Amino acid sequence: TADGELTLLVRDQSRPNGIALSPDETVLYVANSDADNKVWMAYDLDDSGASNGRVFFDINDQDAPGAADGMKVDRAGHLFATGPGGVWVISPDGVHLGTIMMPEVTANVAWGDDGRTLYMTSSTSLYRIKLTTEGIIPGP
């Protein structure tokens, strides 16, 4: 709240972890890192809080190492989410567009200052890749 009071928004996850906002900040994505329930959730946001919690994308059928973890969005609203095998690219409509395959379990991602370089942390290393899409870089 405006006076600094903590507000509980949802309590329906077993291991919430990474979070990201849609470009218009009306959807909050949350990675559930529970090995028994590997999903990315989506919640609608408005002045009253979060509602309409739903599974945005389910990766429980994936055998590659890794769980739903850190994520970012690009200006088009695509989610770049670390998960089994690497970084999953998912459209705003929940369609898996592809995966940036990684040699190690990937934990988190960040956009570089050019907005087109995606940095990725993994088990023991740091990687980067140049993309054609433009990421959302937090401003002052």
Where do the language-model regions lie?
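Short loop/turn segments immediately following beta-strands, especially the blade-tip
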Residues: 42-49, 130-138
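Beta-rich, blade/repeat-based domains predominating
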Residues: 6-30, 59-84, 103-116
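A short, acidic, flexible beta-alpha connecting loop/helix-capping segment that sits on the rim
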Residues: 104-106, 115, 122-127, 132-135
